[in-house]
Amino acid sequence: MSEELGKISKPQAENVQLKKKLYLVQNIQNYFPGNKDFESLLKEYWDSISDQLDNLEKTAGNINFIYIEGMYQEYDVASKLLNDNNKWCLSTIESRVKSGSNYKKIENENNYKQLIDWTRIAQLGFVSENAKEVTEENYKKIITERSTIIHDELNRIKEGEAALFIISSGSHKFPEDMEIFNVIPPSLDKMNRWITENQNSLQDSNQEKEVQDEGEQDKQSGLWTP
């Protein structure tokens, strides 16, 4: 069952606090490094997420566990990776870890690395039907195993406990006895609009930069190019 934030009455809240709960947050990352406008929106998004989680914890229950899709590392390593790639997300979870929430890895390292490899192979395309069938078979097998790993980990959450799950995809199947809360701040719409409006100009800018970089490399190499 999925609840809408800000619309939980007191009797409902008391009932929800006794259940298993999962707070879902979309993992928006810095898709345009160096773009200050996008980084400002990104900060606004994660600040809004943090505020909504604060309110949700007061109503439905404190966060006992934190999971991040795609992370199989322990917290000391995971936090360093986040600091390099998504410091806004790190800020959101770091304060909660310091307050007592338990960060737990949601992925199995071997399974997740195989998923990455089979995904890359599948993206290359195939000449042979046999190779295509083998790849598809192994990809489906790894996906099924991963779904079981994630489901089993979430199923360890006990009644009355809550977990924050920062997700990158929407294809997960959650335990049926778990109350699901989708944390979606208005700033997400603003960010999506910005991406839509600026994507073409950003792509043109990146292509122009690539051409300039190639030109510089040609000059440095001393080779003549048409």
Question: Which sequence ranges carry the predicted segments?
Answer:
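Compositional signal for N-terminal targeting/processing segments
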Residues: 1-226
